[in-house]
């Protein structure tokens, strides 16, 4: 008997979803967006990205498959309706534990914070100590990785259309945190630092290469190899989404059909990690400024009090003037 993933309906509680996500390493959210919306995104991508630019020939995505990066630039519908989908952001808030929650907080809250407000940022996690000569030193302690905060906010790691075509083999199983290894190794009970989402822009079936995931593999040792009986496939209808954690083994399936299997992938990472895809070249200011403030913030056009700031620019929207810099 093969492994399986738990499927949730869109109106089920975030707590139930995230509890299962933490236990199993992956979940499916059925019918999270209208199927027609996914068709609109695909049409925008095809209109804005030439066929030649969609070709792929890499070990991860071999010749015959299709890929398109910078989805938020290729499709404003993707940026506004999928990337910042409220349910997805609620789950990301619960998994990545940001200080500034992204689903509920107004984008401009804190933008005009005073110096005194900024001086208390992270209160309880730091103190100013003095030596005998009255020189002062800032001393930090780590936050609880299970309670947070684990970052100020989170950003888009990468956004890519991943299309499986006929005649390729199963993609090698891999973990999303592999892009940061060996620099960030596996530590038991470490902070979660990548959350991935794959939207089904077509139906995902076993025959057309539905994403393969290994439940509970996020708890395994690095050298444990998954048996076929331990691998589940994210079989789901168009408009559904599968989400998984940084250490969950996964990979595209093999398609035995002539039809395309199109997924729209994006990941979220803490603001203190380097983004996998360079968002500022992929989605430059002249494109980003046409998007909503929340989309801009998730893409990366925002800063914390310590990271990513630009003097003279607003921390919650770096494309406009403001006073968000610490100096």
Where are these regions (language model features)?
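Catalytic palm active-site di-aspartate
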Residues: 25-26, 239
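Catalytic core of non-heme Fe(II) oxygenases with the double-stranded beta-helix
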Residues: 140-152, 163-235, 273-283
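Non-heme Fe(II)-dependent double-stranded beta-helix
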Residues: 2-23, 30-179
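Short hydrophobic-aromatic micro-motifs
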Residues: 29, 197, 242-244
């Amino acid at each position: 008997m093969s492994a399986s993933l738990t499927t949730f309906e869109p109106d089920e509680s975030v707590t139930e979803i995230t509890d299962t996500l933490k236990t199993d390493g992956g979940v499916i959210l059925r019918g999270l967006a209208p199927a027609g919306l996914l068709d609109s995104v695909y049409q925008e991508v095809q209109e804005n990205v030439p066929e030649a630019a969609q070709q792929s020939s890499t070990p991860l995505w071999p010749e015959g498959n299709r890929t398109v990066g910078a989805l938020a630039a290729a499709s404003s519908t993707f940026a506004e309706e999928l990337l910042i989908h409220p349910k997805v952001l609620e789950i990301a808030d619960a998994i990545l534990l940001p200080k500034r929650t992204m689903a509920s907080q107004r984008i401009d809250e804190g933008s005009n914070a005073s110096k005194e407000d900024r001086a208390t940022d992270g209160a309880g996690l730091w103190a100013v100590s003095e030596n005998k000569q009255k020189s002062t030193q800032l001393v930090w302690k780590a936050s609880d990785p299970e309670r947070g905060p684990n970052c100020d906010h989170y950003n888009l790691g990468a956004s890519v259309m991943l299309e499986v075509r006929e005649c390729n083999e199963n993609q090698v199983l891999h973990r999303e945190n592999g892009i940061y290894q060996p620099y960030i190794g596996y530590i038991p009970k470490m902070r979660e630092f990548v959350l991935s989402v794959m939207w089904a822009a077509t139906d995902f079936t076993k025959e057309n290469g539905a994403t393969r995931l290994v439940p509970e593999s996020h708890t395994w040792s690095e050298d444990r190899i998954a048996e076929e009986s331990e691998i589940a496939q994210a079989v789901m209808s168009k408009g559904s989404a599968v989400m998984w954690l940084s250490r969950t083994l996964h990979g595209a399936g093999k398609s035995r059909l002539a039809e395309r299997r199109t997924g729209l992938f994006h990941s979220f990472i803490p603001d203190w990690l380097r983004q996998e895809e360079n968002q500022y070249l992929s989605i430059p200011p002249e494109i980003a400024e046409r998007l909503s403030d929340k989309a801009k913030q998730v893409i990366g056009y925002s800063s914390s009090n310590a990271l990513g700031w630009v003097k003279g620019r607003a921390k919650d929207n770096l494309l406009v003037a403001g006073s968000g810099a610490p100096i």
